[in-house]
């Protein structure tokens, strides 16, 4: 066994703040080293008892709110704070592996998953880590050609010395305003990814015209490279113009990696998309039920509404924990595509205050009641869409469980029909 070094400095004492999946991955990794003491702070009461200045390094889990007491004090020790991805980078930086980091409010999970899928389909060894669910350090012993990393703004705030070969920001819209003072601060957190990337591009920041599309453009539901048609959405297993936008981001990533785009197009045609992201569950009694439980902010729900239909035939299930979201931003899409809204969850009155007077709606006790009322109201050729624009932890363990419950409710409805 060896001692643990970070930036060529021997680390003998480390404090871990937070012990979720990320914290556990750090702890498991450090178990491979000797001469290091690791203290773990798992809650507020424990944290205040530690002398932060006595530690060589402090690792902080992304879920720890640095803007709230008692954790604000951590900002005074910025030079000691590292993320799990910084540690991961220290141990792969001298290999030939390429690292790609993607952040954004909406679409980043689709982009990183599609990128990883294409790389593997082209015959490369690729790993997918980060905010998508697998901590980077869990993959430290594997050999790979490419490492695709989904990063959140919370993770970027913790970065110390990581250097990605390529960084990319997509689709930044208001989110996590319970954690940031305003949208500008949140957007800047995302843009800070550039400081940790050797190459970098931005594809759309809140429709402010900051968009690098390279040689690609969308014309009538298809992607063109200059004047050559590459791909029609109908040739894929995806739907909606937002997925064409996601594909353009992936193509630009692959371009910058120097890979063959024509071969990549064949791989993209096989990609099935993500669970709980604009997935058709079933058609029951002529009504189509769509699961977009991964739509956890206003921007994601707007993207779903704008992509699913050209008619005013959506019955929308909306609600959960709003995270300070600005629901007035969806009024235009509600007016154009939504027949009725069922609002549920912890912040239903908050959501109501934004959309009252702009659409027909009803408040519900929970998602199950919202579903039951929606299925009763829906007619043939209409759509019941779960795209909550909210986090799920008031009622569920996460967006995946919320989506699974929705799918089960659809299955039960089909059995009764």
Swiss-Prot record:
Pathway(s) it belongs to: Cell wall biogenesis; peptidoglycan biosynthesis
Catalytic activity entry: UDP-N-acetyl-alpha-D-muramoyl-L-alanine + D-glutamate + ATP = UDP-N-acetyl-alpha-D-muramoyl-L-alanyl-D-glutamate + ADP + phosphate + H(+)
EC number: 6.3.2.9
Listed GO CC annotations: cytoplasm
Domain of life: Bacteria
Matches recorded under Gene3D superfamilies: Mur ligase, C-terminal domain, Mur-like, catalytic domain
InterPro entries: Mur-like_cat_sf, Mur_ligase_C, Mur_ligase_C_dom_sf, Mur_ligase_cen, MurD
Claim: Nucleotide-binding is one of the keywords in the record: yes
Binding site for ATP: 104-110
Compartment list: Cytoplasm
Keywords, ordered alphabetically: ATP-binding, Cell cycle, Cell division, Cell shape, Cell wall biogenesis/degradation, Cytoplasm, Ligase, Nucleotide-binding, Peptidoglycan synthesis
GO biological process: cell division; cell wall organization; peptidoglycan biosynthetic process; regulation of cell shape
Gene Ontology MF annotations: ATP binding; UDP-N-acetylmuramoylalanine-D-glutamate ligase activity
Family note: Belongs to the MurCDEF family.
NCBIfam families: murD
PANTHER family, A to Z: UDP-N-ACETYLMURAMOYLALANINE--D-GLUTAMATE LIGASE
HAMAP family associated with the record: MurD
Function, as annotated: Cell wall formation. Catalyzes the addition of glutamate to the nucleotide precursor UDP-N-acetylmuramoyl-L-alanine (UMA).
Protein's recorded name: UDP-N-acetylmuramoylalanine--D-glutamate ligase
């Amino acid at each position: 066994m060896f001692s643990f070094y970070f930036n060529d400095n021997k680390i003998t004492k480390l404090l871990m703040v937070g012990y979720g999946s990320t914290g556990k991955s750090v702890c498991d990794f450090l178990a491979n080293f000797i001469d290091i003491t690791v203290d773990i702070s798992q809650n507020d009461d424990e944290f205040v008892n530690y002398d932060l200045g006595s530690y060589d390094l402090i690792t902080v889990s992304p879920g720890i709110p640095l803007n709230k007491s008692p954790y604000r004090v951590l900002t005074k020790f910025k030079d000691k704070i590292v993320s799990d991805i910084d540690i991961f980078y220290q141990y792969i930086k001298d290999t030939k592996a390429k690292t790609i980091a993607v952040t954004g409010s909406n679409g980043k999970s689709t982009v990183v998953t599609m990128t990883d899928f294409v790389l593997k389909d082209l015959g490369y060894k690729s790993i997918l880590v980060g905010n998508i669910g697998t901590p980077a350090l869990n993959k430290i012993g594997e050999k790979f050609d490419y490492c695709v990393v989904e990063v959140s703004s919370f993770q970027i705030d913790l970065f110390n010395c990581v250097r990605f070969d390529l960084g990319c920001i997509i689709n930044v819209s208001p989110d996590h305003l319970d954690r940031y003072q305003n949208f500008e601060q949140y957007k800047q957190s995302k843009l800070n990814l550039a400081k940790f990337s050797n190459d970098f591009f931005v594809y759309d920041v809140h429709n402010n015209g900051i968009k690098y599309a390279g040689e690609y453009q969308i014309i009538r539901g298809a992607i063109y490279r200059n004047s050559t048609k590459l791909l029609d959405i109908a040739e894929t297993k995806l739907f909606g113009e937002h997925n064409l936008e996601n594909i353009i981001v992936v193509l630009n990533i692959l371009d910058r990696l120097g890979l063959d785009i024509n071969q990549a197009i064949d791989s993209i045609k096989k990609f099935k998309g993500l669970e709980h992201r604009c997935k058709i569950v079933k058609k029951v009694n002529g009504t189509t039920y769509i699961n977009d439980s991964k739509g956890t902010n206003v921007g994601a729900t707007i993207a779903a509404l704008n992509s699913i239909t050209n008619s005013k035939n959506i019955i929308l299930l909306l609600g959960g924990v709003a995270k300070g979201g600005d629901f007035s931003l969806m009024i235009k899409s509600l007016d154009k595509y939504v027949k009725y809204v069922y609002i549920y969850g912890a912040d239903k009155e908050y959501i109501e205050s934004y959309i009252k007077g702009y659409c027909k709606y009803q408040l519900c006790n929970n998602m199950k009641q919202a579903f039951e009322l929606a299925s009763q109201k829906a007619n043939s050729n209409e759509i019941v869409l779960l795209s909550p624009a909210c986090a799920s932890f008031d009622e569920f363990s996460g967006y995946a469980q919320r989506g699974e419950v929705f799918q089960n409710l659809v299955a039960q409805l089909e059995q009764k029909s």
